[in-house]
């Protein structure tokens, strides 16, 4: 009987974790460049409790991490000079949290020194790893699809786009940023385009996520009912043994 309760508890734990992830997806449905996440689970075989008829394999549900769907989000027009969207697989490079970080959130601006930065103030890096400085005296800023930043006839820099060989090596690092978890540096991107005056919306589909919430609730209730039935069987068995004795 105990095995069934342990299996049920393990499933409830993963359902709670999945609920947190789905709720976070919904909360970020309007976050620029956000990528939808899903829970990864696996079954783990454990040593079972002894029963009257001997031992039998028992498998528990285990949380193994979070998978992100990096498919392209919809492009929305803003008209902002410093709003940039990536069409294709690539990431902007920024200097944050003590190192180089990566993002799809192109809501950029300039700080008082004229440096191109994120909404959190992290400098946006060019293809050489340097900062990009805008001089307001040189006129409007133009960003080409190839990432070249110009003011009139003057080339200011080129926004660096990179991507890792394996997207699963990117881990969240706050402020809509990712960090590289390996010693292999992400490679420059040549087949993606930058669109000025546009932003990439989240790829979250709210209807799908709400449906998941309903399914999680039903699954949780089903597991709870199974555990209640198991506990009731245990109580009945104890009562019968008491009467026999």
From Swiss-Prot:
Annotated protein name in UniProt:
Flagellar basal-body rod protein FlgF
* Primary site of residence: other
Q: Which InterPro entries match?
A: Flag_bb_rod_N, Flagellar_basal_body_rod_CS, Flagellar_FlgE/F/G, Flg_bb/hook_C_dom, FlgE/F/G-like, FlgF, LlgE_F_G-like_D1
Q: Which Pfam families match?
A: Flg_bb_rod (PF00460), Flg_bbr_C (PF06429), LlgE_F_G_D1 (PF22692)
Q: Which NCBIfam families match?
A: FlgEFG_subfam, flgF
* SUPFAM superfamilies assigned to the protein according to its UniProt record, in alphabetical order: Flagellar hook protein flgE
Q: Key word Acetylation present in the record?
A: no
For biological process, the GO terms are:
bacterial-type flagellum-dependent swarming motility
Describe the family membership recorded for this protein in Swiss-Prot or TrEMBL.
Belongs to the flagella basal body rod proteins family.
Task: Quote the subcellular location field of this record.
Answer: Bacterial flagellum basal body
Q: How does it assemble?
A: The basal body constitutes a major portion of the flagellar organelle and consists of five rings (E,L,P,S, and M) mounted on a central rod. The rod consists of about 26 subunits of FlgG in the distal portion, and FlgB, FlgC and FlgF are thought to build up the proximal portion of the rod with about 6 subunits each.
**Coiled-coil residues:** none
* Annotated keywords: Bacterial flagellum
**A single GO cellular-component term on record:** bacterial-type flagellum basal body, rod
């Amino acid at each position: 009987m105990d095995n069934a309760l342990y299996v049920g508890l393990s499933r409830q734990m993963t359902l709670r974790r999945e609920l947190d992830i789905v709720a976070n997806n919904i909360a970020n449905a309007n976050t620029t460049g956000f990528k939808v996440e899903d829970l990864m689970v696996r079954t783990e075989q454990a040593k079972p409790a002894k029963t009257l008829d001997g031992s039998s394999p028992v498998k528990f549900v285990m949380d193994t991490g979070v998978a992100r769907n990096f498919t392209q989000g919809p492009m929305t027009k803003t008209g902002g000079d410093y709003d940039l969207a990536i069409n294709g697989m690539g990431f902007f490079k920024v200097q944050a949290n003590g190192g180089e970080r990566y993002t799809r959130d192109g809501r950029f601006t300039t700080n008082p020194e004229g440096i191109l930065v994120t909404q959190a103030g992290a400098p946006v890096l060019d293809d050489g790893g340097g900062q990009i400085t805008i001089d307001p005296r040189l006129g409007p800023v133009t960003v080409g699809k190839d990432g070249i930043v110009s003011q009139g006839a003057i080339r200011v820099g080129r926004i660096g786009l990179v991507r890792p060989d394996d997207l699963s090596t990117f881990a969240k690092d706050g402020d809509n940023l990712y960090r590289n978890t390996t010693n292999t540096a992400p490679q420059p991107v040549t087949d993606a385009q930058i669109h000025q005056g546009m932003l990439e919306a989240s790829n979250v589909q709210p209807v799908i996520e709400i449906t998941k919430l309903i399914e999680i609730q039903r699954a949780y209730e089903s597991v709870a009912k199974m555990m209640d039935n198991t506990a009731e069987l245990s109580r009945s068995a104890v009562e019968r043994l008491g009467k026999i004795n």
